[in-house]
Amino acid sequence: MSPEAKILTNDNGLHLKSEAKYFFDFNSIDDLKKITDFAKKENKSIQIIGSGTNAIFPEYFSDVVIRSTNNDFTLDDAGDRVSLSVGAAVVWDDLIDFCVNKGLFGLGNLAGIPGTVGAAPVQNIGAYGEEISNFIDHVECFDLDTNNQVRLSKSECKFGYRKSIFQESDNLIIVSVGLSLLKKFEPKLHYQDLKDHSFTDEGELVETVRNIRNKKIPDPKDFPNLGSFFKNPTITKEEYEKNSKLHELKSYDSDNGDIKLSAGEMLDKLGLK
């Protein structure tokens, strides 16, 4: 394998002028081993990118830049849940459509999030009361330090609110994600934007979530942006009850019993939208 010089201006959400001198597409573990050998010989670090929808690209990448082309879907319909392995290069919303068409449930609240499947576990993407970690069984990775493939279980991924082990470990390249999905429609509708709706199937939920998102955040293809990248602040119920001004804000119950406040609404009220 040989690198190519590549212009990346149209490969990031902000459409920033950017280029890489050493760029590789990869589709297999063997590809990654060859790329790693090249990087070591050139004394270069390795930087992985996805669709660039949640990143600020530099004008010039001096290190080796890689991107997955693994668009594979592997389905195993056994047991109470359906196991689905998805390649890192699959566009997230294409996965949502795949699940709707196959009658696989659980990810509907996460519809409309830009990016790829490989990026989803990194910050444990979430929206409208749901997180991807609730459906992850394992993540297949390539370890740049050992030059070997490794499988991390859900617990080994150390998922938290918008965080995971992948934010701490630069040596792990996500190759594919193993999901465990529901066989019946059990929507989470406790978020204010959804609680007044009634849905008969996942397709209706997905369409509604996409419509809500489109009203709030423009498509990066139409207006360059990084989407919703901030965290909603979380406080205890006791703190929430003590401050009556907080009751004027949108709030949601967290799974651990705390109260989550809407950072987006706070920014709107401060005139920082």
Q: Which positions does each model-derived feature cover?
A:
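Phosphate/pyrophosphate- and phosphate-bearing ligand-binding catalytic cores of soluble enzymes
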Residues: E4, L8-L16, A55, Q149-K273
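Anion-binding (especially nucleotide phosphate/pyrophosphate-binding) glycine-rich loop
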Residues: M1-F135, D143-D145
